[in-house]
Amino acid sequence: MFEGSITALVTPFADDRIDEVALHDLVEWQIEEGSFGLVPCGTTGESPTLSKSEHEQVVEITIKTANGRVPVIAGAGSNSTAEAIAFVRHAQNAGADGVLIVSPYYNKPTQEGIYQHFKAIDAASTIPIIVYNIPGRSAIEIHVETLARIFEDCPNVKGVKDATGNLLRPSLERMACGEDFNLLTGEDGTALGYMAHGGHGCISVTANVAPALCADFQQACLNGDFAAALKLQDRLMPLHRALFLETNPAGAKYALQRLGRMRGDLRLPLVTISPSFQEEIDDAMRHAGILL
């Protein structure tokens, strides 16, 4: 079971190419700071604007650099079932510990279509699958009943990344799927409540910028020390908010640039975060104690 603070990695660019050195260094820093796991090529990794070869390159660099020290859950989603299967096969051949599969975006399939999508991917996989429910990006929500059906019929499906922000979901999903279902939130701001509802961890954007604090927060939750977790949440909450003032990962990349970790380059149609919001991110990083 995946647990704790699992970083949804940004993809560093330099001159519109993958910055391999910056990606390697980011992975090393994440592991040194205590992150429990890594997710390359998800939403935060700008996967929609990566070519197939770039997608594979990012996954391979992350796995090679991590070298088994922490699990790597490779983003392998697509609105094309066939393409998602190809990404899954690449990830398992590259040595990924699991794959993250987003609900099909743009196509707007029915609940039956969602079920068949995951069933086909499951049949092609030999490693754990985490279902990624993010209706704000995909325009469809995976119903709890559909999720339970997928879990029951697809032996490689082990859990969910829930990015709905709805704190009813973890309890409903646990009741529908059972205690062995891996509950991961994708919303940093509500992670404390999610963990109190029985969650196991967070696939986190903020952990790109504050990996040690996010790891400590998750460890406190896993230990049942919610008083300590609340203190850390109060340090992190302004940063959770500020990083999403404009479309993710613009805020996270700006923050990493301010920390000297990489360039802040984004790929169109995403653009650099507005100057007024940059100031808010700076203030939030100072509040968290990660920027002087």
Swiss-Prot record:
It comes from the Bacteria. Its EC number is 4.3.3.7. Optimum pH is 7.7. The keyword Cytoplasm applies. Gene3D superfamilies: Aldolase class I. Pfam families: DHDPS (PF00701). Pyruvate binds at residues 44, 203. It is an enzyme of class 4 (lyase). It catalyses: L-aspartate 4-semialdehyde + pyruvate = (2S,4S)-4-hydroxy-2,3,4,5-tetrahydrodipicolinate + H2O + H(+). The record marks 43, 106 as: Part of a proton relay during catalysis. Belongs to the DapA family. Homotetramer. Catalyzes the condensation of (S)-aspartate-beta-semialdehyde [(S)-ASA] and pyruvate to 4-hydroxy-tetrahydrodipicolinate (HTPA). NCBIfam families: dapA. This is 4-hydroxy-tetrahydrodipicolinate synthase. It comes from Rhizobium meliloti.
